[in-house]
Amino acid sequence: MVAEAEVVFQQSLPAVLEIELFDGVSSAVKSPVSSPKLGFTQSTASVSGSLTTSPVQADIFPEGDCDPSVLDYIPTIRSGSFADIGPKRNMEDEHIRIDDLSSQVGSLFELPKPSAFYAVFDGHGGPEAAAYVRENAIRFFFEDEQFPQTSEVSSVYVEEVETSLRNAFLQADLALAEDCSISDSCGTTALTALICGRLLMVANAGDCRAVLCRKGRAIDMSEDHKPINLLERRRVEESGGFITNDGYLNEVLAVTRALGDWDLKLPHGSQSPLISEPEIKQITLTEDDEFLVIGCDGIWDVLTSQEAVSIVRRGLNRHNDPTRCARELVMEALGRNSFDNLTAVVVCFMTMDRGDKPVVPLEKRRCFSLSPEAFCSLRNLLDG
């Protein structure tokens, strides 16, 4: 496993994280130094603007009749990513890839191991909002918030992490409102994936998507916050907004949750059709979990979750390279005429005893039998 941290961006912007920065998918430049076995739960943010945390299911960290191999499982994390401007004139996607979070914030926090953090930001109305959140992500999500400190993951810890993530989304949203250099009509969707030990927690506001592959089956770890989502449509209409026939919020946005876009939001504390509160899902990783795919809507506009999982799974079986898998996913979406920027992140979970060899599905293996005559000929050939 290579412990690395990566922030990828397209524009030439000042770097603020102590990590390697990549301009698109080119070579890295150094940044200046600055700062169904287990439980599956979902937390939906309140629509009133207050912070709420739904209770964590008791079986998310079971200790009773659970298979001991599940309790002993520790994922080994590696990842890759790829981004392409697609047919658009400007690149408004940003993403973060940190395989070893402890190496980045270890001086500030005690974290369970392994720990990792990933994010995709899909900007609109310009690239500034997505770039701003990406640049300040460590501060928003870890430094400014009361992120819980412990080396052990428990139900209490999970609740505290969820609250911290929810606050981070709201604080990032407020920071965009206060930054005079960012237009009120500029915004970004945001999806983050945090791994702490066996815990995977995904927070989402917008139409990026995270999909977990469990034994080849796609499990959505986020919901698309689009006007066609009936629950989102109801919330928007109850908040005084409206959805047009062609699927736009207040005739402007194709999403119902986003950071920024303060020209569409009422004053802080008021109920607005467009909100920044994330929807949070969490799951306990097991040996059955192979990888996580995170992508912007440019991927999901033309690919289903299961199609994306199948593409990545085939790639890992061929070459076992998550970066190549991310590129293949983007190229497949482009081949299907995606009309947006495209970003894909592939996070692999691999137990220590699997090695680096790709796992070949049983159905791909072939057995051959020899006739007695052929067997005798082969033995004579081997015996010389």
Swiss-Prot record:
Mn(2+) 2 binds at D122, D297, D340. Its EC number is 3.1.3.16. Gene3D superfamilies: PPM-type phosphatase domain. Keywords: Hydrolase, Magnesium, Manganese, Metal-binding, Protein phosphatase. Mn(2+) 1 binds at D122, G123. Belongs to the PP2C family. This is Probable protein phosphatase 2C 49. It catalyses: O-phospho-L-seryl-[protein] + H2O = L-seryl-[protein] + phosphate; O-phospho-L-threonyl-[protein] + H2O = L-threonyl-[protein] + phosphate. Binds 2 magnesium or manganese ions per subunit. Transmembrane segments: none annotated.
